[in-house]
Amino acid sequence: MDEVVVNGIRRGDLIMPTTVTSGAAFGLDLDVMDTPRNNTLLSKAQLDALNVQNPGSFSYLTSSSYSDASFGQPNIPRIRGQYADLFLNGMRDSFTLNGYGAPISFNNVESIDIVKGPAAVQAGPGAGVGGSIDVTTKMPSMTKFALTADIEADSQQKRVAVFDVGGPLMDGLAGRLSVQSNDSGSYYHDMFFHQQSIYGALLAEVTSNYTIAFNADYVDTRYREDDGINRVNQALIDNGTYLTGGATSPIAGYGTTVDLTGTTTLNGRTIIDEPDGTGAHAQHIKVQLIQTLRVNDDFSIVNNTLYDYINRYNQIMAYYADTAKGSYTIENKTDFKINFSTGSVKNNLDFGFTYRYAHVLDIQNFANEPVSVYDLSQDPSTFVFPAANQLYGGAIPYTAADGRIQYGVPGSYAAYANDTIDSNLQDGAIFLEHRMQFSPQFSLLYGLRGDLVQLNDSDPLYNQGIAAGLGPDGANGFCPTYCMSLPESQHTSWYGLYNGNISLVYSPVEQVSAYLTYNKAQYVDANANDGAVGTLGVDPTTQLRQGTLLIEGGLKFDLLNKSLFISTAGFKQERAVPVGVGGSQHSQAHITGAEIEANYQPSARFFATASYSYLHTTLDTPSGFWNYPAQMGSNFDGAATGIVWDSNQTFQDPGIPQHLFNVLANYKLENGLGFQANLQVTGPIETTQSGYINLTDSTNVPQYLIDNGGDYKSPKIPWQFTLNAAAFYTFLDHYTAKFSIYNLTSEHNLVNDYPFYGNDFITRVPPRSYDLTFTAKF
């Protein structure tokens, strides 16, 4: 982003989006007032103020952004109720899908631009059509050296150190190195998060009009997934009452009978992931080269290349396991940016072409994850799925990343089709974005993009599965569902995709702008972890040609000499959303909502941000789930998969709050002492789908639902709030000590998980914690 300093505020302290331009939304460098989307620019000052370490914290700084637990380490949030796409300096990070996967590091982050709605034509839409998160990475200064050292520790075993240095190396060349070491424990029993990150950047001015920007990032993370606790029901949410009891039949991936006979209150530190053998390791490498040739003030060429590599595994002894083994993406994109005039009309063009190749080898096993059978009041050694029963559920041993032996289900096993897949996707595209400024009041922006995509996918466990007896010949009459009845591989044809947008912006005065945007696009919808795509046994268009439609309008205000910015937006969006086991089915979602955001910074001593969003999502077909809420007596694990819903009813999308509000205030005295406060409020959240059940056609329905006529109401997390506060002191011009209190009132807050497991996993937010950070800057 290009810097514009106002009101005497130093670059590092600026939070006003009107003081910068950004190309994240449309590829053109636009002021936020001229951008016909609701976009939020998160500056370094805002990210540091809340110590943002993962996308779950975005909900404290922007509207319509909410992250469910994502099995412990969300790597993308939901925006407007849908998962988002992640970009690095304008280039897509392919290894995201539903928030689950390798944890990301913020060691390389300078600022973040969050654009609500699907990515425009320059970036190309992906499965995360809720919004795009474009990370602008740290770059060195050509004129001065800077050094920052940061040490942080808290009362819940957080231990983080950062060293960041950069500046000119020689005439026309600058470099920067940032190293972060996170060696944290956890509030929860036997949990840890150890992440080492090394980021480096070089900036070379080869000539006065040719620059090269290079960055590389290596992140190594060893951790344990945090799935929270099981046996979710309303009493557990309301007062912590946990039902105890064990399995009365052999533990299997489906159909285990569990007799719940007692109650207790679990220690708040208890989670299901405590057994020995549970663990995860992820290695993530990103290398990027950006070349810019400025032919003149009105014509430039930008070539951007990103190589993205991931190698990881995860195993939960309860049992879940997956791996992304030796997976990588490489993309090269060339933009031609031209400014010209035709009569009185000023034109800005960004057109170009791109090619991306994505190889993801993903192996999963959630076939043997009978979450409700484990009694978390017992010894953690009992939270283990019997290895001898893995084959019965379709899982076989294989070698995951790092040579680790885990159990996985072949992708051609029909009951869990394509959840294991060796995916090789090609995507070539051309694009055009054109802005026409007719007068100071009126501008029109339109964009067009065409993609050609082709997929080669195969089952990496096919031969092993056949040898283990999972093929049709060894299925004992359970085919075609519970056997490897799907083909080993598929090579699709080339498919064409379109993407188009048109926007009108009207500014009656310089301080006010109004916009209306229409965006319709097709995209590839990944259906396995880490962005893998599988089409074994299905029509490839179900994954390679999904669609979304967005209509959005808004008002923006730049007031009080650029010290107050207010943005409002209303929108309607339609898209296909993944539902059910593994997200293998689709439902059409109809999303409406409204957002308001405000930034206020009258001086370098004070800033404040606030936002509110309302979201309402209706599904054409219901979102299924695994278990009914836990109840006293006999429970049948996986019983809710037997639900048949009554027709002629409306289904609301579960798992996200309709209302989200946040506010942040930061005040600094002239003597270096400062204070900070932050509040987040979330509306009620249903853990699973609610609705009327067809009792005649459904199976394994609990008696209480039969008695009330099949009116199923999901457990609901009530209104919640989190209040954080901090005091800091800057002294001797270079040093800052900051004392923070998170969850100041020690609220018993809860975070839901993916709605399919909404009655199986729920996470308690840790109680009040104390954090001390010391920073030195030179």
Feature locations, PLM:
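Face-selective signature of the C-terminal outer-membrane beta-barrel domain
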Residues: 287-309, 325-462, 507
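Conserved C-terminal beta-signal and adjacent last beta-strands/turns
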Residues: 337, 348-349, 549-553, 607, ...
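Acidic/polar loop-and-plug regions of large Gram-negative outer-membrane beta-barrel proteins
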Residues: 182, 186, 203-205, 209-288, ...
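Outer-membrane beta-barrel translocator/receptor signature
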Residues: 107-110, 122-200, 206-210, 285, ...
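Gram-negative outer-membrane beta-barrel transporters
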Residues: 563-576, 585-695, 733, 745-746, ...
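Short acidic/polar hinge/loop motifs at secondary-structure boundaries
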Residues: 67, 76, 92-116, 136
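Structural signature of Gram-negative outer-membrane beta-barrels, strongest in the C-terminal barrel
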Residues: 205, 346-358, 421-575, 591, ...
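Short, acidic, small-residue-rich periplasmic hinge/interaction motif at the N-terminus
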Residues: 1-45
